[in-house]
């Protein structure tokens, strides 16, 4: 049996002001996990570019690499380095519906 000791640092930062948003950004830059309210539930997120943070997120959720978490992006340009190729149909949907509730699996 393989057990892993993991210290998870989780922050719940209310984003009611610019200072709150700046604190949330610092927490993410520092590799911490962050509680994020969505339109339906609270999620746990991290900086997708921080491999250590992603490992802590997977451990906190009891998941392995076979069930990776989604990566949320604010702009199509943010996909550079995340996906190998963005199909033209997906790009057209992004341009038509972002920002907004559009989920794409690439």
Question: What is the meaning of each model-derived region?
Answer:
Residues 2-106:
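Active-site-adjacent structural elements in enzyme catalytic cores
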């Amino acid at each position: 049996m393989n057990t892993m000791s993991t210290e998870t640092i989780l922050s719940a930062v209310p984003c009611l002001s610019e200072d709150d948003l700046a604190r949330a950004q610092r927490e993410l830059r520092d590799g911490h996990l962050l509680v994020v309210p969505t339109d339906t539930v609270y999620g746990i997120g991290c900086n997708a570019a921080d491999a250590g943070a992603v490992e802590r997120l997977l451990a906190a959720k009891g998941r392995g690499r076979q069930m990776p978490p989604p990566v949320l992006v604010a702009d199509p340009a943010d996909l550079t380095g995340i996906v190998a190729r963005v199909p033209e149909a997906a790009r057209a949907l992004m341009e038509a519906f972002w920002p907004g509730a559009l989920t794409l699996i690439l």
